[in-house]
């Protein structure tokens, strides 16, 4: 049997033997039948919900497993990858020997041999000259469905000459019994070989490992070509003006980039090259915990046939209880991007960005709701990737927990963070783009900055009115802040005004400044990082 040039014999080149059958780039209709088959058991089997989407469980792994991420250290990667065992920074790029890689590959190929396999050929990246052609191999129907949702679906013509640049072999059912003597973290593994151009997955069923795996690879390849690779959402206005939104979980990235006046380019992963900003993906991977039709109608409306729900609670009658986080707070849904109405068509790309927005949810109550950044401050705050959450303590007191994640996506960076900052600023300068730091968190009132005020701030950035505003400088962080903005409560623009006394703010500001300084020290082992210290806060 031959399908599009793929035969069971051809898979022997990957080390997969005696394949019973190949289901190549199956239709959504076929996947719908396959993943609900009564012959399936355990995590393989999905159930149909009243919304029309199929729901699956991913087992004990309801999120990525960063401690089980490995990269083969060889001549290709030795001097380029930002390794976990080198320099001052802690990251998830754990080195793997060629010998251990060979063993892990044998485990996965043995698991996939003799099976009926699903093969999905897809693109990562909307621009033909920089996209990755990726071949996914799995024995699980819903994992093929996830890939079909999340990556860019080739046309029939594009499939005819499809040659994979990268191969992902998902052996979720196999684990590594020799992990201890090999010095690994556990029996589970997500391993990359940049020379062989293969990703191996073992022990974890979580679909996001395939999505973020290829994002990590793009994060390795593109900056080395001078193309910015970004963990951000992006949209475009009626006049073709593009904005990108960086931010960690809970900062409002998805909410604020979803705007009825603007078309969505994408919600999570983008590149920026000589032509402009482009999406890496062909779908969205949205959180669904406490999802409601009223609060997020776009996402709720996207959950229908062909969408794939993960780790949600499905009642006996097929209804989904989105408020139930008993399996995980990280309940998700993947769906093709065309399930959202207001998107850029037919290709998820637009021109150069003129507005770059860093979102932070500062629970310390120090940072202003908005500030305009200099070029050096842009790099500094991009490298810092700060946000903070309020976490309850045993005594019932809520204390902020700071998070610093380089480039607002440290888990997915393969190169030193300063390389991403340099490429981003180079692209911004060429496009005449301006960066802003927007705090969607708290201030001295103890209340979170209202979504109304935050949307007013975003509107002022996008329509340019913030650039006409009178500015003053906030001490300690040396940030330029507006004294007034249309549609925004003027009493909140200077965070000092939200405290009973300036001294109260000053005390908190000194504390937060020291946290920034301590965190940034890890970048000073690179000359580019050391040069940026002056752009940070002063104590």
Curated annotation (Swiss-Prot):
Reported cofactor(s): Mn(2+)
Residues involved in ATP binding: 212, 231, 247-255, 296, 332, 448-449, 454
Compartments reported by the entry: Cytoplasm
GO cellular component: cytosol
Entry superkingdom: Bacteria
Keyword hit for Iron-sulfur: no
Ligand binding (substrate): 64, 206, 212, 332
Family annotation (InterPro entries): PEP_carboxykinase_ATP, PEP_carboxykinase_C, PEP_carboxykinase_N, PEPCK_ATP_CS
Pathway membership, UniProt: Carbohydrate biosynthesis; gluconeogenesis
EC number(s) reported in the record: 4.1.1.49
Binding site for Mn(2+): 212, 231, 268
GO MF entry, a single one: ATP binding
Entry's cofactor comment: Binds 1 Mn(2+) ion per subunit.
Gene Ontology biological-process annotations: gluconeogenesis
One Pfam short name: PEPCK_ATP
HAMAP family: PEPCK_ATP
Stored PANTHER family: PHOSPHOENOLPYRUVATE CARBOXYKINASE (ATP), PHOSPHOENOLPYRUVATE CARBOXYKINASE ATP
Similarity remark: Belongs to the phosphoenolpyruvate carboxykinase (ATP) family.
Assembly behavior: Monomer.
Role played: Involved in the gluconeogenesis. Catalyzes the conversion of oxaloacetate (OAA) to phosphoenolpyruvate (PEP) through direct phosphoryl transfer between the nucleoside triphosphate and OAA.
Protein name in UniProt: Phosphoenolpyruvate carboxykinase (ATP)
